[in-house]
Amino acid sequence: MTNILRVKCAVIGDAAIGKTALIQVFLHDRSYFPKNYSMTTGVTLSVGKVNIPDTKDAVELYLYDCSGKEVYLDLVQELWADAPLAIIMFDTCNEPSFQHVSTWASRLSKNSTCGPKIGVLVGMKADLKERRRVSTREGQEMAERIGFHYLESSAKEAEGVQEPFFYLASQWHKTHNEKGELQDDVL
């Protein structure tokens, strides 16, 4: 019998940095990349399942893809308040999006109703090395400051796409396995 943990995960960051693209490529097993940009208005909910290796367990991630536009901020902050997991993203070719990471982390922490988040900071567009403005080291240092794990990804090249989701699912599973709570859901 498979144990399935269900958990809410907020995906946040500035507009037009690749949040939706990363989710879509992950959900379609790296076989689909959205060719045209379509701004997320408010929040889009997607569900992705991660099987935990060497177990019969799986984690269903309820991915709240939150718009990075200020006009939707009040709405999205309410929706991510009770999300135990979070992905904060920035564009490695866009230094202002990186500078805004600490603001996103502060908003996430300030509006949390479920304590500290398990999180990943993801540097997007890692394939565009010639246009890069933020180094891997800078990303790692920022992740350390906000208490998150750091990864880089390219949704377009389907590189590093699964890792953020597998990391969060594994950490969530580990937390619940240690507590003996594998039948509990957190939505």
Regions found by a protein language model. Name each.
Residues M1-D184:
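TRAFAC-class small GTPase G-domain
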